[in-house]
Amino acid sequence: MKTLSKLNLLFAISVILWGCANDDNLQEVLPVNSENTEESLYLENGNEVIIYPNGVAVEKLPDGRIVWGGDIALNEKQLQALTEPDTRAGILRDNSMFWPDGIVYYTLADDVMRSGAYIDIYDAMKHIEERCNISFHKKQSNTKNWIEFVLSEDDVSRSHLGMTGGKQNIWVTSDVNTSTAIHEICHALGMIHEHQRMDRDNYIVVDFNNIRPEWHQWFYRTSIPHNTYGTGLEPLDTKSIMIYGSYGENTAINPDFPYMWRKTDGTTWTNNNVLSEMDILTLNAVYSKPHYTITCKPQCTLSGTVSGSDHYAKGEICALQAFPEDNRG
């Protein structure tokens, strides 16, 4: 577990102000940098936390990867969009980040096979395939974009956000479970965390006072619409596979108390192990089934028999020849 060497670094990352225990007075205050320059803090494990002038905080790993929200590896284009001066905590989204026709190609690294992690990865892919318009196929020699599942070197599972082009990794632990594999694959399909939605404060309370300082950047809100991507599915989904549970032994300062709860009635929720109904609707809204126009050429034969005066019975046999590869449009 990562820890900060100085407690006062808590205030350099974010501060939560409370007013008379009234949720309406809860305010998330991101860092203010009047000099318009980047600032850096270091965790005890040596990882660097970079705070940008707009208040966005990301973690830089020793291998150079930039991580946002705890387990989302950003490419250069996404990092630039995230850290634009006018972007409070957003990220660039466009159609190029989605996998064409919902077809995802993949490979499994040797260490994943040796560790047995591939079993849960296969189970995760099957779970998604059975519920969504998405299919997973092993990489072919001419495949241009694909996912390679590799073992994580720091015991944390992570993924890129959406299709990034070429080979992209999903890092899993040797003891990864199916639900974590589903979660990371969903990041690769373009989904973000439900608890980082721009409107999350309308539905839940995030108690930064009970979140370890080094985890604060995992819970900053985004400034883009949530996972539904315009499907009109408004309520925050506490059953989603993309939301953390209300309690966390490693996340919470006091694990006996929740760090997130529902705003309406104060109830909590647990980690979810499967895609929720809204997760499925969201993925199927983004990855709708492809529609093809197929040209068919009829070939018919006509045969008949005469069975008496003025009576004629005929039978028509037709065969349709379709050429989908040449006539998709």
Predicted segments with their positions:
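C-terminal motif of bacterial Sec signal peptides marking the signal peptidase cleavage site
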Residues: 17-19
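Processing junctions and N-termini across compartments
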Residues: 14-15, 312
